[in-house]
């Protein structure tokens, strides 16, 4: 299952910003970029009354 690990790139090395659950030597793929920008294409505009109705049905 994919994991999102925030990291900083310094001196040619990606440094995770939190503890990671990986084995020593495990290979990973890094996708650089802003997650918000990538997810924006999946966003759908919905009227506030539809959102309110949805929320009330879930309660």
Curated annotation (Swiss-Prot):
A Pfam match: AF2212-like
The keyword Transferase appears for this protein: no
InterPro entries, alphabetized: AF2212-like (IPR008203), AF2212-like_dom_sf (IPR024069)
Keyword annotations of the record: Toxin-antitoxin system
Stated family: Belongs to the UPF0165 family.
Function per UniProt: Possibly the antitoxin component of a type II toxin-antitoxin (TA) system.
Name by which UniProt lists this protein: Putative antitoxin AF_1090
């Amino acid at each position: 299952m994919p994991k999102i690990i925030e990291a900083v790139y310094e001196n040619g090395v990606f440094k995770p910003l939190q503890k990671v659950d990986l084995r020593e030597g495990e290979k990973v793929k890094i996708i650089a970029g802003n997650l918000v920008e990538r997810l924006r294409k999946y966003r759908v505009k919905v009227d506030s009354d539809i959102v309110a109705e949805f929320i009330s049905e879930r309660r």
